[in-house]
Amino acid sequence: MAIKHLAGLAIAAAFISTQAQAKTEVEWWHAMGGALGKKVNEIAADFNASQSEYEIKPVYKGSYAETMTSAIAAFRAKEQPAIVQVFEVGTATMMGADKAIYPVYQLMKDTKESFNPDDYLAAVTGYYTTNEGNMLSLPFNSSTPVLYYNKDMFKKAGVANPPKTWKEMEEVSRKLLASGAKCGFSTTWQSWTQIENFGARNNVPVANNNNGFAGLDTKFKFNDSAFVHHIEQMGKWSKEGIFKYGGRQSDGMPLFYTQECAMTM
Protein backbone atom coordinates (compact mmCIF):
# COMPACT_ATOMS: atom_id res chain seq x y z
CA MET A 1 0.00 0.00 0.00
CA ALA A 2 2.46 2.22 -1.84
CA ILE A 3 5.90 1.40 -0.87
CA LYS A 4 8.38 2.87 -3.78
CA HIS A 5 11.34 5.09 -2.74
CA LEU A 6 10.53 3.60 -1.60
CA ALA A 7 8.76 2.33 -1.56
CA GLY A 8 4.54 3.71 -3.16
CA LEU A 9 3.25 4.28 0.36
CA ALA A 10 -0.23 4.27 2.11
CA ILE A 11 -1.85 4.25 5.50
CA ALA A 12 -3.53 0.92 6.26
CA ALA A 13 -6.09 1.54 8.97
CA ALA A 14 -6.20 -0.93 11.82
CA PHE A 15 -8.28 1.14 14.21
CA ILE A 16 -8.80 -0.27 17.67
CA SER A 17 -11.77 0.60 19.81
CA THR A 18 -11.09 3.02 22.66
CA GLN A 19 -13.30 4.34 25.37
CA ALA A 20 -14.24 7.98 25.27
CA GLN A 21 -11.85 10.17 27.21
CA ALA A 22 -10.71 13.77 27.37
CA LYS A 23 -7.99 13.23 24.78
CA THR A 24 -7.77 10.03 22.78
CA GLU A 25 -4.22 8.96 21.91
CA VAL A 26 -3.78 7.57 18.40
CA GLU A 27 -0.54 5.68 17.86
CA TRP A 28 0.78 5.90 14.30
CA TRP A 29 3.59 3.57 13.26
CA HIS A 30 5.56 4.72 10.24
CA ALA A 31 8.73 4.02 8.24
CA MET A 32 9.83 7.58 7.60
CA GLY A 33 13.37 8.24 8.84
CA GLY A 34 15.57 11.33 8.51
CA ALA A 35 14.00 14.44 6.97
CA LEU A 36 10.80 12.56 6.14
CA GLY A 37 10.52 11.48 9.74
CA LYS A 38 10.77 15.10 10.85
CA LYS A 39 7.98 15.93 8.42
CA VAL A 40 5.78 13.22 9.89
CA ASN A 41 6.35 14.68 13.35
CA GLU A 42 5.42 18.13 12.03
CA ILE A 43 2.20 16.78 10.51
CA ALA A 44 1.27 15.15 13.81
CA ALA A 45 2.18 18.26 15.83
CA ASP A 46 0.13 20.51 13.56
CA PHE A 47 -2.90 18.24 13.86
CA ASN A 48 -2.54 17.96 17.62
CA ALA A 49 -2.39 21.74 17.93
CA SER A 50 -5.49 22.16 15.75
CA GLN A 51 -7.88 20.45 18.19
CA SER A 52 -8.10 19.05 21.71
CA GLU A 53 -9.90 15.74 21.21
CA TYR A 54 -7.13 13.57 19.77
CA GLU A 55 -3.37 13.23 20.25
CA ILE A 56 -1.42 11.63 17.38
CA LYS A 57 1.67 9.74 18.57
CA PRO A 58 3.97 9.00 15.59
CA VAL A 59 6.40 6.12 16.17
CA TYR A 60 9.24 5.30 13.76
CA LYS A 61 9.51 1.51 13.36
CA GLY A 62 12.37 1.17 10.87
CA SER A 63 12.28 0.17 7.20
CA TYR A 64 9.09 -0.45 5.25
CA ALA A 65 9.40 -4.21 5.70
CA GLU A 66 10.26 -3.88 9.40
CA THR A 67 7.28 -1.62 10.01
CA MET A 68 4.87 -4.03 8.34
CA THR A 69 6.21 -7.13 10.10
CA SER A 70 6.20 -5.27 13.43
CA ALA A 71 2.55 -4.37 12.90
CA ILE A 72 1.65 -7.97 12.05
CA ALA A 73 3.43 -9.24 15.16
CA ALA A 74 1.73 -6.57 17.28
CA PHE A 75 -1.68 -7.55 15.93
CA ARG A 76 -1.09 -11.19 16.82
CA ALA A 77 -0.11 -10.08 20.32
CA LYS A 78 -3.19 -7.81 20.48
CA GLU A 79 -0.93 -4.77 20.88
CA GLN A 80 -1.41 -3.22 17.44
CA PRO A 81 -1.23 0.54 16.79
CA ALA A 82 -4.26 2.50 15.62
CA ILE A 83 -2.64 3.38 12.27
CA VAL A 84 0.28 1.83 10.41
CA GLN A 85 2.06 2.89 7.25
CA VAL A 86 2.55 0.02 4.79
CA PHE A 87 4.39 0.23 1.48
CA GLU A 88 2.80 -0.93 -1.75
CA VAL A 89 4.67 -4.25 -1.70
CA GLY A 90 2.58 -5.12 1.34
CA THR A 91 -0.73 -4.48 -0.42
CA ALA A 92 -1.54 -8.15 -0.99
CA THR A 93 -0.65 -8.98 2.61
CA MET A 94 -2.98 -6.29 3.89
CA MET A 95 -5.74 -7.29 1.45
CA GLY A 96 -5.62 -10.78 2.89
CA ALA A 97 -5.64 -9.55 6.48
CA ASP A 98 -9.39 -9.02 6.78
CA LYS A 99 -9.46 -9.02 10.56
CA ALA A 100 -6.28 -7.00 11.00
CA ILE A 101 -7.30 -3.86 9.14
CA TYR A 102 -10.31 -1.59 8.94
CA PRO A 103 -10.66 -0.78 5.20
CA VAL A 104 -10.86 2.96 4.66
CA TYR A 105 -13.99 2.76 2.50
CA GLN A 106 -15.75 0.78 5.25
CA LEU A 107 -14.47 3.07 8.00
CA MET A 108 -15.79 6.15 6.23
CA LYS A 109 -19.13 4.46 5.56
CA ASP A 110 -19.56 3.28 9.14
CA THR A 111 -18.69 6.68 10.60
CA LYS A 112 -20.74 8.51 7.95
CA GLU A 113 -17.76 10.70 7.07
CA SER A 114 -17.71 12.50 3.73
CA PHE A 115 -15.26 10.63 1.51
CA ASN A 116 -14.66 10.74 -2.24
CA PRO A 117 -11.95 8.43 -3.62
CA ASP A 118 -11.92 10.51 -6.81
CA ASP A 119 -10.23 13.29 -4.85
CA TYR A 120 -7.04 11.23 -5.15
CA LEU A 121 -5.01 10.45 -8.27
CA ALA A 122 -6.26 7.24 -9.84
CA ALA A 123 -2.70 6.17 -10.66
CA VAL A 124 -1.98 6.19 -6.94
CA THR A 125 -5.22 4.81 -5.51
CA GLY A 126 -5.14 1.93 -7.97
CA TYR A 127 -2.51 0.36 -5.73
CA TYR A 128 -4.93 0.17 -2.83
CA THR A 129 -8.32 -0.33 -4.49
CA THR A 130 -10.14 -3.61 -5.08
CA ASN A 131 -11.65 -4.68 -8.40
CA GLU A 132 -14.99 -3.54 -7.00
CA GLY A 133 -13.68 0.00 -6.62
CA ASN A 134 -13.32 -0.05 -2.83
CA MET A 135 -10.33 1.87 -1.48
CA LEU A 136 -8.65 -0.16 1.25
CA SER A 137 -6.22 2.47 2.53
CA LEU A 138 -5.20 6.10 2.19
CA PRO A 139 -2.23 7.08 0.00
CA PHE A 140 0.60 8.64 1.97
CA ASN A 141 4.00 9.76 0.68
CA SER A 142 3.43 7.98 -2.63
CA SER A 143 6.55 7.89 -4.77
CA THR A 144 7.30 8.27 -8.46
CA PRO A 145 10.61 7.76 -10.28
CA VAL A 146 12.52 10.96 -10.98
CA LEU A 147 15.60 11.35 -13.17
CA TYR A 148 18.46 13.26 -11.55
CA TYR A 149 21.36 14.48 -13.67
CA ASN A 150 24.64 16.30 -13.10
CA LYS A 151 24.52 19.61 -14.99
CA ASP A 152 28.28 20.11 -14.87
CA MET A 153 28.93 16.69 -16.41
CA PHE A 154 26.27 17.38 -19.03
CA LYS A 155 27.88 20.71 -19.90
CA LYS A 156 31.30 19.08 -20.24
CA ALA A 157 29.79 16.49 -22.61
CA GLY A 158 28.02 19.16 -24.65
CA VAL A 159 24.56 17.89 -23.70
CA ALA A 160 21.96 20.64 -23.30
CA ASN A 161 18.90 18.69 -22.14
CA PRO A 162 18.28 15.51 -20.13
CA PRO A 163 17.02 12.42 -21.99
CA LYS A 164 13.29 11.70 -22.18
CA THR A 165 13.37 8.20 -23.68
CA TRP A 166 15.54 5.12 -23.23
CA LYS A 167 16.99 5.67 -26.70
CA GLU A 168 18.00 9.18 -25.68
CA MET A 169 19.37 7.78 -22.41
CA GLU A 170 21.77 5.63 -24.42
CA GLU A 171 22.75 8.47 -26.76
CA VAL A 172 23.38 10.92 -23.92
CA SER A 173 25.31 8.31 -21.92
CA ARG A 174 27.64 7.65 -24.85
CA LYS A 175 28.41 11.38 -25.06
CA LEU A 176 29.06 11.44 -21.32
CA LEU A 177 31.44 8.49 -21.57
CA ALA A 178 33.26 10.16 -24.44
CA SER A 179 33.76 13.26 -22.28
CA GLY A 180 35.40 11.27 -19.48
CA ALA A 181 32.50 10.11 -17.30
CA LYS A 182 32.94 6.66 -15.79
CA CYS A 183 29.31 5.69 -16.39
CA GLY A 184 26.21 7.20 -17.88
CA PHE A 185 23.59 6.26 -15.32
CA SER A 186 22.64 4.06 -12.41
CA THR A 187 19.26 3.30 -10.86
CA THR A 188 17.77 2.59 -7.45
CA TRP A 189 15.00 0.17 -6.49
CA GLN A 190 15.44 -1.74 -9.75
CA SER A 191 12.36 -3.96 -9.56
CA TRP A 192 10.27 -0.84 -8.98
CA THR A 193 11.83 1.46 -11.59
CA GLN A 194 12.85 -1.06 -14.25
CA ILE A 195 9.97 -3.54 -14.00
CA GLU A 196 6.90 -2.08 -12.32
CA ASN A 197 7.17 1.50 -13.55
CA PHE A 198 8.55 0.46 -16.92
CA GLY A 199 5.46 -1.71 -17.32
CA ALA A 200 3.11 1.04 -16.19
CA ARG A 201 4.72 3.57 -18.52
CA ASN A 202 4.35 1.21 -21.47
CA ASN A 203 0.96 -0.21 -20.45
CA VAL A 204 2.40 -3.69 -19.91
CA PRO A 205 0.99 -5.53 -16.84
CA VAL A 206 3.47 -7.18 -14.49
CA ALA A 207 0.96 -9.96 -13.74
CA ASN A 208 -2.28 -11.43 -15.00
CA ASN A 209 -5.64 -11.11 -13.22
CA ASN A 210 -5.58 -7.33 -13.43
CA ASN A 211 -2.09 -7.21 -11.92
CA GLY A 212 -3.21 -9.52 -9.14
CA PHE A 213 -6.28 -7.62 -7.98
CA ALA A 214 -8.73 -10.07 -9.55
CA GLY A 215 -7.65 -13.16 -7.62
CA LEU A 216 -4.95 -15.02 -5.73
CA ASP A 217 -4.21 -17.41 -8.62
CA THR A 218 -2.00 -14.74 -10.18
CA LYS A 219 1.18 -15.26 -12.19
CA PHE A 220 3.90 -12.74 -12.95
CA LYS A 221 4.49 -11.78 -16.57
CA PHE A 222 8.15 -10.83 -16.30
CA ASN A 223 8.87 -12.92 -19.39
CA ASP A 224 6.76 -10.63 -21.54
CA SER A 225 8.83 -9.57 -24.55
CA ALA A 226 8.81 -5.91 -23.47
CA PHE A 227 10.40 -6.70 -20.09
CA VAL A 228 12.85 -9.20 -21.57
CA HIS A 229 14.01 -6.73 -24.20
CA HIS A 230 14.45 -3.95 -21.64
CA ILE A 231 16.44 -6.05 -19.17
CA GLU A 232 18.59 -7.45 -22.00
CA GLN A 233 19.27 -3.86 -23.06
CA MET A 234 20.24 -2.93 -19.50
CA GLY A 235 22.64 -5.89 -19.46
CA LYS A 236 24.21 -4.74 -22.72
CA TRP A 237 24.58 -1.20 -21.39
CA SER A 238 26.17 -2.55 -18.22
CA LYS A 239 28.89 -4.29 -20.24
CA GLU A 240 29.57 -1.07 -22.16
CA GLY A 241 29.70 1.14 -19.06
CA ILE A 242 26.58 3.06 -20.02
CA PHE A 243 24.74 1.64 -17.00
CA LYS A 244 26.26 0.60 -13.68
CA TYR A 245 24.50 -1.51 -11.07
CA GLY A 246 25.07 -0.11 -7.60
CA GLY A 247 23.11 -2.55 -5.47
CA ARG A 248 19.59 -3.10 -4.23
CA GLN A 249 17.13 -0.50 -3.01
CA SER A 250 18.90 2.89 -2.80
CA ASP A 251 22.44 1.48 -2.66
CA GLY A 252 23.18 2.88 -6.11
CA MET A 253 22.80 6.53 -5.06
CA PRO A 254 26.49 6.99 -4.06
CA LEU A 255 27.44 6.41 -7.71
CA PHE A 256 25.63 9.66 -8.46
CA TYR A 257 26.74 11.56 -5.35
CA THR A 258 30.41 10.84 -6.12
CA GLN A 259 29.91 11.86 -9.77
CA GLU A 260 30.91 8.43 -11.03
CA CYS A 261 27.59 8.28 -12.88
CA ALA A 262 26.04 11.40 -14.38
CA MET A 263 22.44 10.26 -13.97
CA THR A 264 20.30 8.21 -11.63
CA MET A 265 16.63 7.56 -10.93
Residue ranges and their predicted role:
Residues 21-27, 48-54, 132-134, 155, ...:
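Immediate post-signal peptide segment of exported/extracytoplasmic ligand-binding proteins
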Residues 105-120, 204-229:
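Short, solvent-exposed loop/beta-turn-alpha elements that line the ligand-binding surface or hinge
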